[in-house]
């Protein structure tokens, strides 16, 4: 079993909602392990090993009864964050790299704005793998923003 070590020495909490993602959750959480960011996992009813695997990376695992509302689940996860800024990601996503100096500079210079991250979607098809790159809103001050919309949720003030 991996020893849980979260330094919580940065101003950011990473919030993740999940359900039955035992094949993805370790890669997701491990990708943030060296950042020192707080990790928050809101589980919406896993029946596989997702929560057990997540417990190897964080003690901050919360149950959220699924109510057919992605915004409600994400807002619940954000409410558990100890830090003023959050990054919200899905459990099948992972961090490739992060420039903490640039992140902290962005937050300091634009405290009332939403930060965007570049997501690379890898789509497998009969023609092989294709990449779709897009910028999405994922970093924000938890006291100023929240999610709205049951499906295709969006960050709003």
Describe these PLM feature segments:
Residues 23-26, 48-57, 98:
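Acidic helix N-cap motif at the loop->helix transition within catalytic regions
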Residues 2-11:
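Extreme N-terminus of proteins, especially the signal/transit-peptide cleavage junction
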Residues 26, 33, 45, 65, ...:
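Active-site-proximal cofactor/substrate-binding loop regions of enzyme domains
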Residues 31, 43-52, 66, 90:
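A conserved acidic beta->alpha catalytic loop
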Residues 16-35:
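Short, well-formed alpha-helical segments that are part of the catalytic scaffolds
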Residues 10-11, 72-78, 84, 89, ...:
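Catalytic-site signature of metal-activated, phosphate-bearing donor transferases
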Residues 37, 51-76, 80:
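Conserved donor nucleotide-binding strand/loop of the catalytic core
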Residues 16, 37-45, 62, 91:
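Short beta-strand/loop segment that forms part of the nucleotide-sugar
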């Amino acid at each position: 079993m991996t020893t849980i070590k979260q330094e919580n020495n940065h101003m950011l909490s990473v919030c993740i909602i999940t359900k039955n993602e035992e094949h993805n959750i370790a890669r997701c959480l491990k990708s943030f392990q060296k950042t020192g960011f707080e990790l928050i996992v809101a589980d919406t009813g896993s029946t596989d090993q997702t929560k057990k695997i997540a417990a190897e990376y964080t003690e901050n695992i919360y149950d959220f009864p699924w109510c057919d509302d992605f915004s409600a689940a994400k807002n619940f996860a954000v409410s558990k964050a100890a830090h003023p800024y959050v990054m919200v990601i899905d459990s099948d996503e992972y961090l490739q790299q992060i420039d903490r100096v640039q992140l902290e500079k962005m937050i300091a210079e634009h405290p009332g704005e939403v930060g965007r991250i570049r997501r690379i979607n890898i789509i497998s098809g009969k023609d092989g793998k294709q990449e779709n790159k897009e910028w999405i809103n994922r970093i924000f001050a938890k006291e100023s923003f929240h999610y709205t919309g049951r499906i295709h949720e969006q960050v709003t003030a």
